[in-house]
Design a protein with these regions (language model features):
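Non-catalytic propeptide/linker segments at domain boundaries
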Residues: 61-87
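Acidic (Asp/Glu) carboxylate-rich active-site/surface patches
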Residues: 27-32, 48, 78-87
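Intrinsically disordered, low-complexity regulatory segments enriched in Ser/Thr/Pro
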Residues: 42-65
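Short Lys/Arg-enriched alpha/beta "domain-start" segment
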Residues: 1-43, 64-72
Length: 87
């Protein structure tokens, strides 16, 4: 059983898994907390039982992508793929 909103939790988890950035999942009070990691970039995306989504972490390409995931879900659009930075 998930503490976060079931449909949104499922969407976020699928996005993180399909882009290969899901590192960890934790159930916290009133939310599901996902940890995403790509190379040295690490960020969190929390899905609350109300449907609210919160992105946490230092500004990085990963955080920017998680913010796009958030706005895409809110707008009912498809979630964009994560495009890692080119060195």
């Amino acid at each position: 059983m998930t503490n976060g909103h079931p449909r949104i939790t499922h969407l976020v988890q699928n996005a993180l898994e399909s882009n290969g950035v899901l590192d960890d999942t934790n159930e916290i009070q009133y939310a599901t907390k996902f940890t995403a990691q790509f190379e040295s970039f690490r960020a969190h995306i929390l899905v609350y039982n109300t449907g609210k989504i919160v992105v946490q972490g230092r500004l990085s390409p990963l955080v920017t992508w998680l913010q796009h995931v958030n706005t895409s879900i809110k707008a009912g659009r498809s979630i964009p793929a994560f495009e890692p930075p080119i060195d």
